[in-house]
């Protein structure tokens, strides 16, 4: 787990004026998301979200992901404490509508994302921190897309939102 998080830290790139590319599909531009300012303390008091995947969509994509939570810059004293837990949740959203939910299995999140079109943002709730994190980048929904594999998972980077 620590190795996966370290590898993810090495892959983080800053926002540039040119559109970024989705590492799993270089032809798909990735839209940077402006994260909110970090909260005063990383330990939150946010209850486990009740995110669910709707069943009334005809189109799906799949994602295999390893998470990287960027704590080092804002919380250097806590960055070494990060722990992935079975009760953690990764969710995909288009706007404020939840379109996919997953919990970790052996350090990976296996998620089906339903929808039709739009910019997908990822949110992650940590049971350890009782806090919500948002992915630094969004991507466009594509029907039948397969983002990541067990051997090469997608590695989204997250920052704390505190909401």
Question: Which residues does each predicted region cover?
Answer:
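Extracellular beta-sheet/turn segments enriched in Thr/Pro/Gly and aliphatic residues
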Residues: 35, 48, 53, 136-163
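Non-transmembrane "mature" sequence context
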Residues: 22-25, 118, 160
């Amino acid at each position: 787990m620590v190795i996966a998080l370290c590898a993810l830290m090495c892959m983080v790139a800053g926002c540039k004026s040119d559109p970024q590319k989705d590492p799993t599909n270089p032809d798909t531009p990735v839209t940077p998301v402006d994260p909110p300012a970090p909260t005063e303390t990383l330990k939150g008091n946010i209850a486990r979200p009740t995110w669910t995947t709707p069943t009334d969509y005809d189109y799906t994509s799949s994602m295999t992901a390893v998470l990287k939570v960027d704590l080092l810059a804002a919380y250097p004293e806590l960055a070494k404490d990060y722990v992935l837990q079975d009760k953690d949740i990764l969710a995909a959203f288009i706007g404020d509508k939840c379109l996919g939910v997953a919990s970790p299995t052996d350090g990976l999140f296996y998620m089906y994302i339903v929808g039709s079109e739009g910019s997908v943002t990822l949110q992650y709730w940590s049971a350890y921190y009782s806090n919500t994190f948002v992915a630094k980048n969004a991507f466009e929904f594509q029907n039948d897309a397969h983002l990541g594999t067990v051997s090469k998972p997608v590695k989204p980077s997250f920052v704390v939102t505190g909401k």
